[in-house]
């Protein structure tokens, strides 16, 4: 049986032996969101595996990161003949040292490395000499049970691991 958010609120208050005056809905919401975030940091759940693709532009070292990305599984490059190679993750400082002059056309080649630039952009180096497909496998950030209607809102965790969600919220 799946826990709805309403069920979870009731169970937390019952275990804590407090009513809504002692443990408000907003406080429970924060507790539950923190619990969910800890679960998702420590456990990669197959239900949240996602795949995305991006295409590089010759002479441009940046690509857009998929929204909702939480944890990278792998990043692959596919060339025009269908050959697949894994890109290695490096720190952005390494990429800056690897290619000191990104505008130099003589240094353009098939990318080997990627690094985070910010929440929406990655760098790849060497700077691509042509268009390549970048396949990204990752775990997405699930929607919190607290964001829905309390009487009907459920999540994968509240359906298949309701004890984990409840006891995590009580700790």
Language model features with spans:
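Glycine-enriched, solvent-exposed interface loops adjoining structured elements
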Residues: 1-171
């Amino acid at each position: 049986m799946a826990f709805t958010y309403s069920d979870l609120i009731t169970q937390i208050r019952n275990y804590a032996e407090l009513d809504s005056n002692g443990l408000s809905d907003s406080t429970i919401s924060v507790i539950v969101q923190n619990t969910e975030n800890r679960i998702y940091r420590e456990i990669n759940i197959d239900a949240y595996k996602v795949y995305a693709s991006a295409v590089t532009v010759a002479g441009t070292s940046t690509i857009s990161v998929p929204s909702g990305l939480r944890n990278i599984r792998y990043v692959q490059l596919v060339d025009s003949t269908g050959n697949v190679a894994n890109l290695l993750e490096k720190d952005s400082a390494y990429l800056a040292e690897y290619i000191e002059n990104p505008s130099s056309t003589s240094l353009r080649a098939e990318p080997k490395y990627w690094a985070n630039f910010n929440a929406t952009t990655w760098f790849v180096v060497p700077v691509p000499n042509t268009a390549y497909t970048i396949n990204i496998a990752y775990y997405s950030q699930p929607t919190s049970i607290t964001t829905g209607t309390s009487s009907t809102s459920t999540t994968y965790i509240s359906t298949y691991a309701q004890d984990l969600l409840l006891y995590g919220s009580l700790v």
